[in-house]
């Protein structure tokens, strides 16, 4: 290991930098056949992308609950801010997007459990990861707005999730990569098969 960079987020993942020089792996220690490593990586990506979607569901659920509770007690103009149209819209949009993301993620997991075509489920995992990670970012942004100045303070759940959810759109394939995977499968298989 060359080094392990420190990260400021609280997620317990670290990405050590590893360098190999003149390494030989005996044939008995190979996992699968030589040159098949990407097949293992693709299979891993399929499930990891679904896990990213699930993590984002949990974060969005927590944020939606926290900002709804706060908006019910925080007063502005003699009313709870949840009764002001623009704040009510942010709450409603967050819950609606969470509902859609949850349905997408659960349906994708169900299809995999029932033996769906690997290429189709790979694209669907990419769709779930793309939608859920982008959705969680929008929910976090709304939560910071609902909490106001408190939402920007380090000890506030909205600030922490706003900062930490950003990486969900990057690791296991950026949102741009997910869009390329989805579009490629759409052109090969047709959108009806993927949706």
Predicted regions span which residues?
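Alpha-helical membrane and juxtamembrane elements of multi-pass inner-membrane transport
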Residues: 38-39, 85-92, 119-122, 126, ...
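Alpha-helix capping/hinge segments and adjacent helical runs
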Residues: 123-195
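FAD-binding core of flavoproteins
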Residues: 1-66, 79, 175-180, 184-195
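DHp/HisKA dimerization-phosphoacceptor four-helix bundle of two-component histidine kinases
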Residues: 55, 86-96, 127-134
């Amino acid at each position: 290991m060359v080094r392990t960079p420190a990260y400021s987020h609280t997620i317990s993942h670290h990405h050590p930098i590893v360098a190999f020089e003149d390494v030989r792996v005996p044939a008995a220690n190979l996992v699968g056949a030589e040159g098949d490593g990407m097949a293992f990586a693709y299979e891993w990506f399929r499930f990891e992308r679904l896990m990213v979607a699930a993590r984002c569901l949990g974060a969005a659920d927590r944020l939606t609950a926290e900002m709804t509770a706060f908006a019910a007690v925080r007063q502005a103009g003699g009313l709870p801010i949840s009764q002001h149209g623009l704040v009510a819209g942010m709450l409603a949009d967050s819950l609606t997007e969470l509902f859609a993301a949850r349905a997408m993620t659960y349906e994708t997991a169900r299809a995999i459990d029932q033996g769906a075509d690997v290429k189709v489920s790979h694209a669907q995992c990419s769709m779930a990861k793309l939608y859920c990670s982008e959705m969680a970012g929008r929910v976090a942004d709304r939560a910071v707005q609902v909490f106001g100045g408190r939402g920007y303070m380090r000890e506030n759940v909205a600030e922490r999730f706003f900062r930490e959810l950003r990486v969900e759109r990057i690791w296991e394939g950026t949102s741009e990569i997910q869009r390329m995977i989805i579009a490629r499968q759409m052109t090969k298989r047709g959108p009806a098969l993927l949706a």
